[in-house]
Amino acid sequence: MTERALETAAAHATRFLRGLAERPVVAPAGAEELRARLGGPLPEHPSDPAEVVARLAELAEGGLVASAGPRYFGFVVGGSLPAALAADWLAATWDQNAGLFVLGPAAATVEDLSLIHI
């Protein structure tokens, strides 16, 4: 079951968001370091999903920019509001195709309605 993986992701996300005010606004790790950390061969056997999520969070840590934090003034990329983050998680979970109504009626309808606000 994926519950443990989702709980692990939620715990890492919560910890990240709670620490935004204290996080460095510039990622301390460079491209080479991140490639070395995140690269390498794929596992030959299945892995525990929760362990994969935890490992990803650990390896990506030095390459994360605190763009949603209160001290970030680099680019106007905005921050992720809690409701938007949760909605994004649901959208990824539902995995709907908004291209055709028959493939994802709710997603297609939300996409059509969002055009009103553009």
What label would you give each PLM region?
Residues 1-90, 106:
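N-terminal glycine-rich, Lys/His-bearing helix-loop that initiates the first secondary-structure elements
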Residues 116-118:
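Conserved small/polar residues in nucleotide/adenosyl-binding loops
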Residues 94-102:
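Glycine- and acidic
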Residues 102-109, 113:
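Conserved pre-motif C helix in the palm subdomain of viral-like polymerases
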